[in-house]
Design a protein with these regions (language model features):
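A short mixed-secondary-structure module that forms the rim of ligand-binding clefts
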Residues: 46-82
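Acidic-histidine catalytic/liganding microenvironments
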Residues: 25, 70, 107
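Charged, gly/pro-rich active-site loop segments
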Residues: 1-10, 84-161
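General beta-strand recognition
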Residues: 29, 52-54, 74, 86, ...
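Phosphate-coordination/substrate-recognition cap region in phosphate-metabolizing enzymes
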Residues: 37
Length: 161
């Protein structure tokens, strides 16, 4: 049986398709490395800016030490149509107070569970993409998603800035 050839997709359409998958798939899987063992778990992003994804965490969770030892991570989004987006990136502890405050203000669950933004258990990771790939259903081939989106003919960074 011949392998199907995926139809070409324009760069602008790839960005839109990838964003749609991210919006539909509420709980991507975050992959980290624990020594020589990969670890994966579903996460609930607290904010996305284009392909930059913010994930809240508690210091006591295993991924804290894993990311401290190796900040290279991957997020995999899978929607109900089996379309996928994979974001390969680098996780860093968020230090921008304005963004942290915005995340805190917009997330009642964080406020309920942690009580205060100053709670030392709270860490928010900013995952900066270095590569974004999209796959339509089970096409068996990923498309590279451009890191720069075009809106109305003007180039904009894929992080929405």
């Amino acid at each position: 049986m011949a392998r199907p050839t995926p139809a070409p997709i324009s760069p602008d359409e790839l960005v839109a398709l990838a964003m749609a998958v991210m919006k539909a798939a509420k709980f991507p899987v975050l992959a980290t490395i624990d020594g020589d063992q990969p670890r994966a778990r579903p996460v609930s992003p607290v904010r996305t800016d284009g392909f930059v994804v913010y994930v809240a965490n508690l210091r006591m969770y295993h991924k804290t030490a894993e990311i401290a030892a190796n900040a290279r991570v991957e997020l995999c989004y899978l929607d109900d149509k089996h379309d996928q987006v994979r974001i390969t990136g680098v996780a860093a502890v968020l230090t921008d107070r304005a963004i942290l405050q915005s995340i805190w203000d917009g997330n009642p669950l964080l406020r309920q569970y942690l009580g205060t933004i100053e709670n030392p258990a709270l860490i928010v990771y900013r995952i900066e993409p270095v590569r974004v790939r999209y796959m339509k259903e089970w096409a068996l081939e990923y498309h590279e998603v451009p890191m720069v989106a075009r809106v109305g003919g003007a180039a904009l960074p894929a992080n929405g800035s």
